[in-house]
Curated annotation (Swiss-Prot):
Biased segments, Basic and acidic residues type: 1-10
Stated name of the protein: Eukaryotic translation initiation factor 5A-2
Tissue specificity as recorded in UniProt: Ubiquitous. In roots, expressed mostly inside the stele of the mature zone.
Function, as annotated: Translation factor that promotes translation elongation and termination, particularly upon ribosome stalling at specific amino acid sequence contexts. Binds between the exit (E) and peptidyl (P) site of the ribosome and promotes rescue of stalled ribosome: specifically required for efficient translation of polyproline-containing peptides as well as other motifs that stall the ribosome. Acts as a ribosome quality control (RQC) cofactor by joining the RQC complex to facilitate peptidyl transfer during CAT tailing step.
InterPro entries, sorted: IF5A-like (IPR001884), IF5A-like_N (IPR048670), NA-bd_OB-fold (IPR012340), Rib_uL2_dom2 (IPR014722), Trans_elong_IF5A_hypusine_site (IPR019769), Transl_elong_IF5A_C (IPR020189), Translation_prot_SH3-like_sf (IPR008991)
Free-text disruption phenotype from the record: Severe defects in plant growth and development. Delayed dark-induced leaf senescence. Dwarfism, defective sporogenesis and shorter primary roots. Impaired protoxylem development.
Record PTM: Lys-51 undergoes hypusination, a unique post-translational modification that consists in the addition of a butylamino group from spermidine to lysine side chain, leading to the formation of the unusual amino acid hypusine. eIF-5As are the only known proteins to undergo this modification, which is essential for their function.
Family statement drawn from the similarity comment of this UniProt entry: Belongs to the eIF-5A family.
GO molecular function: mRNA binding; ribosome binding; translation elongation factor activity; translation initiation factor activity
Amino acid sequence: MSDDEHHFEASESGASKTYPQSAGNIRKGGHIVIKNRPCKVVEVSTSKTGKHGHAKCHFVAIDIFTAKKLEDIVPSSHNCDVPHVNRVDYQLIDITEDGFVSLLTDSGGTKDDLKLPTDDGLTAQMRLGFDEGKDIVVSVMSSMGEEQICAVKEVGGGK
């Protein structure tokens, strides 16, 4: 046996955070990566083929985590990165004093690594429902290694 300690870096599953899609096939309501941020497309316009080549797609999109507006122009025949976006519901168990939430997973475990949302309205809705003893379910959106609470709803009756 060796007395050496081994330290292994945490690794991810190896799954890609994005997948390629032709710019001409991305539609309003879809997702796209602009400036390395996952975004929801709110407007797409296409210019005609000019004398110097390809038709171009002009995308106007909103960052799904920061709500900032981003724009990009891409030749319609080129591929764009499209983020994998997942949305999962969890039941709220606790809100800590330092602004973290404790959530119940489907498998019965807890998820304790999320902060309260940056949206003050959502945070107020969560705190009010929690303080009143109501059953609160939060939707967590995840994409490209980021996670954020994006919706809150009350289920069933209170205690």
